[in-house]
Amino acid sequence: MAGSFITVECPDCENEQSLFEKAASEVSCAVCGHTIARPTGGKADIEGEVTAVVEAR
């Protein structure tokens, strides 16, 4: 696999959410709606703290 899944903590509400590190679309927090990832053509621009990385198998 060309990327990993990560767990990101929202900077506004501290909700933890899992997403693909190379997200192709904007990812918003499921609780407060704050944008936590923006696509850049490669790895996404992450807003918030990455708390865990799930390694590829």
UniProtKB/Swiss-Prot annotation:
NCBIfam families: PRK00415.1. Its cofactor is Zn(2+). GO terms for cellular component: ribonucleoprotein complex; ribosome. Part of the 30S ribosomal subunit. Keywords: Metal-binding, Ribonucleoprotein, Ribosomal protein, Zinc, Zinc-finger. A zinc finger (C4-type) spans 10-32. GO terms for biological process: translation. Zn(2+) binds at residues 10, 13, 29, 32. Binds 1 zinc ion per subunit. The keyword Chloroplast does not apply. This is Small ribosomal subunit protein eS27. It comes from Haloarcula marismortui (strain ATCC 43049 / DSM 3752 / JCM 8966 / VKM B-1809). The gene is rps27e. Belongs to the eukaryotic ribosomal protein eS27 family. It holds the Pfam family Ribosomal_S27e. GO terms for molecular function: structural constituent of ribosome; zinc ion binding.
